[in-house]
Regions:
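Pocket-lining segment of extracytoplasmic ligand-binding domains
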Residues: 133-184
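N-terminal hydrophobic or amphipathic helices and topogenic motifs
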Residues: 1-72, 88-95, 101
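Hydrophobic/proline-rich hinge and linker segments of small-molecule sensing/allosteric domains
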Residues: 66-90, 173-184
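Short loop/helix-cap segments at secondary-structure boundaries that form the rim of catalytic
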Residues: 58-61, 115, 159-162
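General small-molecule cofactor/ligand-binding pocket signal
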Residues: 29-33, 129-133, 168
């Protein structure tokens, strides 16, 4: 079994991780991985049971089964598009010379899916290049100015202002406004 290092997962699976639950004679290994590593592992058939992004689960729907419990859906918890420059946006890049660089926390993450959905024109017109990076390295890369934009998840959602970064858009709020459903 493989789960993410997300606090939601480690809390939900605490009983299993710390062997507080009777396994009824079953024995299995548990791997804690970044969400992109989990998605890649599922594409490579490495796991029998694993957490996946909803984006990856949709792509893999012909060969995987989504369990009826354990999913995280919610309001007000989506990824944030951040920049180290105030007032910057991939949409502004449409009228600017050159190409910007946007970091996403993995190709088949929900965060990357939302960026592609809402900023597809900037990607299509080659005004921003998408690169994938470990979620915990995105904000440091923005601060170092090695990228123009970053789609941040987990604790970055709450600490970006303290890091001197600027909010371009709350992608989760936009999803909720445009669809009326919780963010997967």
């Amino acid at each position: 079994m493989a789960i993410s290092t997300c606090p939601n997962d480690t809390f939900a699976f605490h009983g299993i991780l710390d062997r507080k639950v009777d396994f009824l004679g079953l024995d299995f290994e548990i791997e804690l991985l970044d969400i992109q590593q989990l998605n890649v592992g599922l594409f490579q058939d490495r796991f029998e049971v694993a957490k996946a992004s909803f984006h990856a689960a949709a792509v893999l729907s012909e060969r995987t089964l989504v369990l009826p419990s354990g999913s995280a859906l919610g309001f007000g918890v989506g990824p944030l598009l951040l920049s180290a420059k105030e007032g910057a946006s991939p949409d502004n890049a449409l009228t600017s010379p050159g190409c910007t660089r946007t970091l996403c926390p993995g190709e088949f993450t929900t965060a990357a899916m939302l960026f592609q959905l809402f900023y597809g024109e900037a990607i299509g017109l080659k005004k921003t290049r998408v690169a994938h990076q470990l979620f915990s390295e995105i904000m440091p890369s923005l601060k170092e100015r090695s990228a123009d934009f970053g789609v941040c998840i987990h604790e970055g959602r709450f600490t970006w202002a303290e890091e001197g970064l600027f909010l371009v858009e709350d992608l989760g709020t936009r999803w909720e406004r445009e669809t009326g459903v919780p963010l997967p």
